[in-house]
UniProtKB/Swiss-Prot annotation:
One of the primary rRNA binding proteins, it binds directly near the 3'-end of the 23S rRNA, where it nucleates assembly of the 50S subunit. This is Large ribosomal subunit protein uL3. One of its GO terms (molecular function) is structural constituent of ribosome. Pfam families: Ribosomal_L3. GO terms for cellular component: cytosolic large ribosomal subunit. It comes from Akkermansia muciniphila (strain ATCC BAA-835 / DSM 22959 / JCM 33894 / BCRC 81048 / CCUG 64013 / CIP 107961 / Muc). Gene3D superfamilies: 3.30.160.810, Translation factors. PANTHER family: 50S RIBOSOMAL PROTEIN L3, LARGE RIBOSOMAL SUBUNIT PROTEIN UL3C. It comes from the Bacteria. GO terms for biological process: translation. Belongs to the universal ribosomal protein uL3 family. The keyword Ribosomal protein applies. NCBIfam families: L3_bact. Part of the 50S ribosomal subunit. Forms a cluster with proteins L14 and L19.
Length: 211
């Protein structure tokens, strides 16, 4: 794993490709405020990692265990802490500059992790894309779930059976998205396509694992 950044989703817009003229939908992610919180080494902690803090927070709003952690590190409390496993050669030197947009470059492939929009309690057709039952000819099922295995042997509902329930509001990772542009003056990264979450939600951007 490599070092990544924490960001906040600003919204979506579009850019035009300079060569083909094609319109490219992009997501704008604000990454201003990433700071090195803690550097973990194999000798001291058993593994190499970099802990990144993002989005300053009042000390009164932080739980006591976290407040003690921030006090020990000597940094201002933040809303988010994210740890990135890295190789020993990737650990920053003491006094190194905090990570910023220059960590990524245009054309690079990344993975984006976020929390999808919550959609509340939904039926099986919307939640799992079921086809549905007949809409006419005497059918009274319409949008119902249908059989869930009660007449099978053994007659019980199996674990992980697709049924109505809470939809969305879950951690999701979108892989292999392309960085279209990096704008250091605005501290934003423009990534092709859509990413999970609503405007203002937190995202983690990391180099793509499968590229």
């Amino acid at each position: 794993m490599a070092l990544g950044l924490i960001g906040k989703k600003v919204g979506m817009t579009r850019l035009f490709d300079q060569e083909s003229g094609a319109m490219v939908p992009v997501t704008v992610i604000d990454v201003k405020g990433n700071t090195f919180a803690q550097i973990k080494t194999e000798d001291k902690d058993g593994y190499n990692a970099i802990q990144v803090a993002f989005d300053a927070q009042k000390e009164s709003r932080v739980a006591k265990p976290q407040a003690g952690h921030f006090k020990k590190l000597g940094i201002q409390p933040t809303k988010l802490l994210k740890e990135f496993r890295v190789e020993a050669s990737e650990l920053p030197a003491e006094g190194a500059k905090d990570p910023g947009v220059d960590l990524f470059s245009a054309g690079q492939w990344v993975d984006v992790i976020g929390t999808s929009k919550g959609k509340g309690f939904q039926g099986a057709m919307r939640r799992h894309n079921f086809h549905g039952s007949p809409a006419a000819h005497g059918s009274m099922m319409h949008r119902r779930t249908g059989g869930v295995g009660g007449c099978s042997t053994p007659g019980r509902v199996w674990k992980n059976q697709k049924m109505p329930g809470q939809m969305g509001n879950a951690k999701r990772t979108v892989q292999n998205l392309k960085v279209v542009a990096v704008r250091p003056e605005d501290n934003v990264i423009l990534i092709s396509g859509a990413v999970p979450g609503a405007r203002g939600s937190y995202l983690v951007i990391r180099p793509a694992k499968k590229k």
